[in-house]
Amino acid sequence: GVVPGLANTSRSRFLRGIAILYIEAIRGTPLIVQVMFLYFGLPLALGMRIPPDVAGVIAIGVNSGAYIAEIVRGAIQSIDKGQTEAGRSTGLTQAQTMLYIIWPQAFRRMIPPLTNQCIISLKDTSLLVVIGVGELTRQGQEIIAVNFRAFEVWLTVAIFYLAMTLSISAVLRYYERKLMIGRRAVPASPSDPQM
């Protein structure tokens, strides 16, 4: 998602066009359709077989990449243009300005939406059940087929998903706090009584 996100902020109309085409095509189609296309459609067109877990990983990765590209673009464009001008005026190239001035500031702003996207991607893995990937939802279905205890099994599956998403959220929140150290506003000093 970083490469198309950077391409979408590029001065090159060609790079921007490719990035926009990718982002809009992926965001404009449901993930389930992308999974089915990668597992059933593409292999027919190419005359090859793609294992279900490989197709699933590619589908989730490509889908996530489109959303991450927009997160990257938004974070970069949220940085004041004066930052770029300041970097350029000190003699930095466009790439150096992006790497040393814009990117560190933009990355801090990306953490909350990236956390959200990471959690969404984890939950989206449940859609891979349609192509036979043996993930958590599939395992739940198989257990229910044996013991017919749907309530307990689906409750357990939900608890597992909740535990995973809360863990991811906690880890990324920790890193967000680490990156924000030294970025908090300094409290105003008390006014001088002698003035």
Language model features: what each stretch is:
Residues 1-195:
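Transmembrane alpha-helices and adjacent helix-loop boundaries
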